[in-house]
Swiss-Prot record:
Keywords: Calcium channel impairing toxin, Disulfide bond, Hydroxylation, Ion channel impairing toxin, Knottin, Neurotoxin, Presynaptic neurotoxin, Secreted, Toxin, Voltage-gated calcium channel impairing toxin. InterPro entries: Conotoxin_omega-typ_CS (IPR012321). The keyword Disulfide bond applies. The modification 4-hydroxyproline is found at residues 4, 7. This is Omega-conotoxins GVIIA/GVIIB. The keyword Nucleotide-binding does not apply.
């Protein structure tokens, strides 16, 4: 999975945690 802070797109499930919609980056926790 992608590390925290990595740019992500809405609807993607590639983050280790989840994607922040307002910043389009993976959450830290």
């Amino acid at each position: 999975c992608k590390s925290p802070g990595t740019p992500c797109s809405r609807g993607m499930r590639d983050c280790c945690t989840s994607c922040l919609l307002y910043s389009n980056k993976c959450r830290r926790y």
